Amino acid sequence: MADFEKVKSIIVEQLGVDESEVTPEAHFIDDLGADSLDTVELVMALEEEFGIEISDEDAEKIQTVGDVTKFIDNLKS
């Protein structure tokens, strides 16, 4: 599994939410209050941190924190 703590810290930094709110089930828009600009910035930060590329199509499918870790795991396997 992708380093959940690393993903979590990026989300906390990018969205300005409390660490306790960032769970695998947390939905970026509904639970963490992200808007479209937030999600673009989050994708860019994740790409930089993990050395990956996330297409716009894939980014649209990523709805929760758990989706991020699964996506990164699939790319790295």
Swiss-Prot record:
<dbReference type="GO" id="GO:0000036">
    <property type="term" value="F:acyl carrier activity"/>
</dbReference>
<dbReference type="Pfam" id="PF00550">
    <property type="entry name" value="PP-binding"/>
</dbReference>
<comment type="pathway">
    <text>Lipid metabolism; fatty acid biosynthesis.</text>
</comment>
<keyword id="KW-0597">Phosphoprotein</keyword>
<dbReference type="GO" id="GO:0005829">
    <property type="term" value="C:cytosol"/>
</dbReference>
<keyword id="KW-0276">Fatty acid metabolism</keyword>
<dbReference type="GO" id="GO:0009245">
    <property type="term" value="P:lipid A biosynthetic process"/>
</dbReference>
<dbReference type="GO" id="GO:0016020">
    <property type="term" value="C:membrane"/>
</dbReference>
<protein>
    <recommendedName>
        <fullName>Acyl carrier protein</fullName>
    </recommendedName>
</protein>
<dbReference type="GO" id="GO:0000035">
    <property type="term" value="F:acyl binding"/>
</dbReference>
<dbReference type="InterPro" id="IPR036736">
    <property type="entry name" value="ACP-like_sf"/>
</dbReference>
<keyword id="KW-0963">Cytoplasm</keyword>
<keyword id="KW-0443">Lipid metabolism</keyword>
<comment type="function">
    <text>Carrier of the growing fatty acid chain in fatty acid biosynthesis.</text>
</comment>
<feature type="modified residue" description="O-(pantetheine 4'-phosphoryl)serine">
    <location>
        <position position="36"/>
    </location>
</feature>
<keyword id="KW-0596">Phosphopantetheine</keyword>
<feature type="domain" description="Carrier">
    <location>
        <begin position="1"/>
        <end position="76"/>
    </location>
</feature>
<keyword id="KW-0275">Fatty acid biosynthesis</keyword>
<dbReference type="InterPro" id="IPR006162">
    <property type="entry name" value="Ppantetheine_attach_site"/>
</dbReference>
<dbReference type="InterPro" id="IPR003231">
    <property type="entry name" value="ACP"/>
</dbReference>
<dbReference type="InterPro" id="IPR009081">
    <property type="entry name" value="PP-bd_ACP"/>
</dbReference>
<comment type="similarity">
    <text>Belongs to the acyl carrier protein (ACP) family.</text>
</comment>
<keyword id="KW-0444">Lipid biosynthesis</keyword>
